[in-house]
């Protein structure tokens, strides 16, 4: 999330928390090792952090209170209240007494995450995506190493025949090590182990790379499992409300886009509400701004992630696709294309999305066409096929399998679309 650092200048305490500084990512993907280093591409002043989410969330909450927000901790929001089709308030339980309370608001920002109070519970228009129906299993080690060419503090992403591993350096020399695969494959693997601990240990042993990286570390008991099922809502906003972050959509953990999309949608929602209150735009105009920019960010990343899951395509094709997804970037002399590596970095760092929002651009990126007859066009077809299969609810198979069937499709759309 390097793009958000300048937007959070008042959160100096983030630096004080001692999080590992993250300067990029190294992927051992297919037959290649390749790294994206923020400092080499964007300069030495751009970086991000490998945060402990519980601690990081508390930092953000504390800062919100310092800025004047009224914070009620321990409350459970039961539902959002509507007057017709307009969100007007919320109902929650009082944390000390358990009594139900209600409040009315000019605008409601649904940041309820996967609970999705408005899209999933109220409107019931959030649709799951079988293509990215993945499950993650992970644990923590004291001590360990990263691959030699890794950017400082960068995540290592290591491909496997039926999934992929992450190795993340955290503060105090702790490492998060996880494996992600499709739910079907996860359940098949689970049958062969008496416990989740045994399964994780076997997975680490199965990968020579991960095994060597963790050889000097000590496993800390406690395995976590999370369903990383992708989904998207039919609408991201409406009269009186904005659905932000995971409430509106969730992609996949492959390129670590979750925190960026949460911050980005929060930025868009805040700007939209402020512009409405100030009388700069109508509520309808603000909703169009939010819906277009947030959905385009999600769909663009969806296309890139679906393509990267085709592990044998190679970084040159990923970079070329990223260049087409970013399209034209604004410069002092007009518009110019960026090189593929920079475009890829801009996408996974979130800079492309923030640049679009700040420049007021909501034009979809230029997309390759299947009739171009080159590898980039075919890679887009593969990603587009995964999208169509997800939209249709088929197949119940890993995205890599769906991508391998890409020749069955012909696509001439100029933008990704998940609705």
Region spans (language model):
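N-terminal FAD cofactor-binding segment of flavoenzymes
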Residues: 1-30
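FAD/FMN-dependent oxidoreductases across multiple families
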Residues: 17-18, 187, 191-272, 277-301, ...
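A short, glycine/Asx- and small/polar-enriched loop/turn
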Residues: 21-23, 30-31, 81-88, 237-239
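Helix-loop-beta segment of a Rossmann-like dinucleotide-binding subdomain
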Residues: 33-51, 89, 180-186
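Short active-site alpha-helical segment characteristic of glycosyltransferases
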Residues: 56-59
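Predominantly flavin-linked oxidoreductase catalytic cores and closely associated redox partners
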Residues: 62-214
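Mobile, glycine/GP-rich and aromatic-enriched active-site lid/loop segments adjacent to catalytic centers
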Residues: 120, 159-162, 168-233, 237-239, ...
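C-terminal helical "tail/cap" subdomain of flavin- and related membrane-associated enzymes
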Residues: 274-419
């Amino acid at each position: 999330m390097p793009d958000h650092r300048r937007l959070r200048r008042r959160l100096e305490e983030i630096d004080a928390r001692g999080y590992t500084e993250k300067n990029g990512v190294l992927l051992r993907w297919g037959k290649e090792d390749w790294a994206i280093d923020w400092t080499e591409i964007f300069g030495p002043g751009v970086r991000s952090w490998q945060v402990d989410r519980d601690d990081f969330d508390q930092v953000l909450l504390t800062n919100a209170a310092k800025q004047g927000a009224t914070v009620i901790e321990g409350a459970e929001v039961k539902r959002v209240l509507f007057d017709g089709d307009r969100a007007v308030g919320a109902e929650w339980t009082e944390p000390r007494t358990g009594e139900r309370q209600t409040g009315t608001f000019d605008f409601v920002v649904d940041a309820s995450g996967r609970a999705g109070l408005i899209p999933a519970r109220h409107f019931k228009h959030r649709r799951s995506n079988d293509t990215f129906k993945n499950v993650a299993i992970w644990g923590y080690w004291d001590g360990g190493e990263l691959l030699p060419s890794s950017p400082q503090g960068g995540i290592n992403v290591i491909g496997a025949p039926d999934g992929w591993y992450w190795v993340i350096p955290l503060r105090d020399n702790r490492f998060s090590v996880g494996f992600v695969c499709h739910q079907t494959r996860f359940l098949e693997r689970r049958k062969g182990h008496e416990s989740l601990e045994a399964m994780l240990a076997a997975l680490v042993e199965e990968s020579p790379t991960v095994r060597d990286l963790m050889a000097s570390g000590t496993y800390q008991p406690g395995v976590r499992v999370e369903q990383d099922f992708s989904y998207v809502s039919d609408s991201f906003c409406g009269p009186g409300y904005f659905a932000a972050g995971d409430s509106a959509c969730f992609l996949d953990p492959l390129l670590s886009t979750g925190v960026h999309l949460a911050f980005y949608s929060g930025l868009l929602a805040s700007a939209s509400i402020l512009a409405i209150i100030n009388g700069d735009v109508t509520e309808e105009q603000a909703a169009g701004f939010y819906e277009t920019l947030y959905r385009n960010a999600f769909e663009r990343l969806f296309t890139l992630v679906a393509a990267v899951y085709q592990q044998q395509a190679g970084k040159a094709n990923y970079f070329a696709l990223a260049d087409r997804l970013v399209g034209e970037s604004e410069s002092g002399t007009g518009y110019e294309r960026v090189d593929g590596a920079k475009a890829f970095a801009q996408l996974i760092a979130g800079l492309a999305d923030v640049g679009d929002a700040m420049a007021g651009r909501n034009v979809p990126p230029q997309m390759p066409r299947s009739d171009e007859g080159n590898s980039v066009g075919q890679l887009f077809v593969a990603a587009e096929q995964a999208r169509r299969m997800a939209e249709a609810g088929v197949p119940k198979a890993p995205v890599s399998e769906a991508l391998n069937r890409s020749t069955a499709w012909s696509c001439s759309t100029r933008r990704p679309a998940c609705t």
